[in-house]
């Protein structure tokens, strides 16, 4: 848990939820939004760590539902998790991460959700590549949301960040283009990807609620 961004008093959570779906955009600033969501997510993860030994699935499922709910509330639509594949011979569907369809002649949001990018993050770019290949580049906006990259080293009794920025640059150049990568706890190594080629837009998740309308244009 990152104490610098953890908020014990989350009375602002209700204010955020009440305003998140408004067209006028949430009243809270991006930094406070990110801290509130981080606190809600990491508190649950800590509880599971303390009460259930080795349970990694439950925190991941909770985080997926939390982020999917906030996306849906902001966009005003519910997601799907499969898409019809155009095929001349068979009817087939493609299982996906959350897909938010904004309507005719508008882009769709492709939302992978992960507690860390160590969970086979290359699949995020691979799924985006499939969507681009099947439906056309630009139809789906790739916007993964990740909790953080910290891991406890029990031997050294310290918390470390595990990041692979050079691999991300290769994925972005040679597999597919992700529009944004949102974090609740932005790693310094990935934040630097905003400044090098190919630029990967790594942002605090709170930014999404203010910039989503521009992204959807």
Label every PLM stretch briefly.
Residues 1-75:
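Interdomain/boundary linker segments immediately adjacent to catalytic/signaling cores
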Residues 56-57, 87-89, 110-117:
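Short, surface-exposed loop/turn motifs that are enriched in glycine and acidic residues
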Residues 57-58, 80-83, 132, 203-206, ...:
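Intrinsically disordered, low-complexity Ser/Thr/Pro/Gly-rich regulatory segments
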Residues 58, 62, 66, 93, ...:
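Short, well-structured alpha-helical interface segments that form or flank functional binding sites
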Residues 73-92, 98-101:
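A short acidic/basic microdomain associated with nuclease active sites
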Residues 99-109:
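Active-site beta-strand-loop-beta-strand hairpin of nuclease catalytic cores
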Residues 112-168:
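Catalytic cores of nucleic-acid endonucleases
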Residues 147-217:
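Domain-level recognition of nuclease-like catalytic cores that cleave nucleotide substrates
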């Amino acid at each position: 848990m990152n104490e610098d961004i953890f908020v014990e008093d989350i009375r602002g959570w209700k204010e955020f939820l009440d305003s998140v779906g408004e067209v006028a955009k949430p009243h809270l600033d991006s930094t406070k939004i990110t801290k509130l969501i981080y606190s809600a997510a990491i508190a649950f993860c800590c509880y599971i760590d303390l009460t259930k030994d080795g349970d990694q699935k439950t925190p991941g499922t909770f985080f997926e539902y939390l982020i999917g709910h906030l996306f849906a509330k902001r966009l005003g639509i519910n997601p799907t998790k499969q898409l019809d594949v155009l095929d001349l011979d068979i009817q087939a569907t493609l299982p996906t991460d959350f897909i938010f369809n904004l309507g005719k002649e508008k882009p769709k949001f492709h939302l992978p959700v992960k507690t860390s990018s160590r969970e086979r993050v290359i699949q995020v770019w691979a799924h985006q590549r499939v969507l681009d290949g099947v439906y056309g580049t630009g139809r789906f906006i790739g916007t993964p949301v990740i909790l953080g990259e910290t891991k406890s080293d029990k031997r050294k009794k310290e918390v470390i960040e595990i990041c692979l920025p050079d691999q991300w640059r290769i994925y972005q150049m040679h597999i597919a283009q992700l529009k944004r990568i949102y974090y609740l706890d932005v790693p310094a190594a990935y934040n630097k990807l905003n400044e090098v080629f190919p630029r990967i837009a790594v942002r605090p998740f709170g930014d999404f609620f203010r910039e989503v309308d521009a992204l959807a244009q």
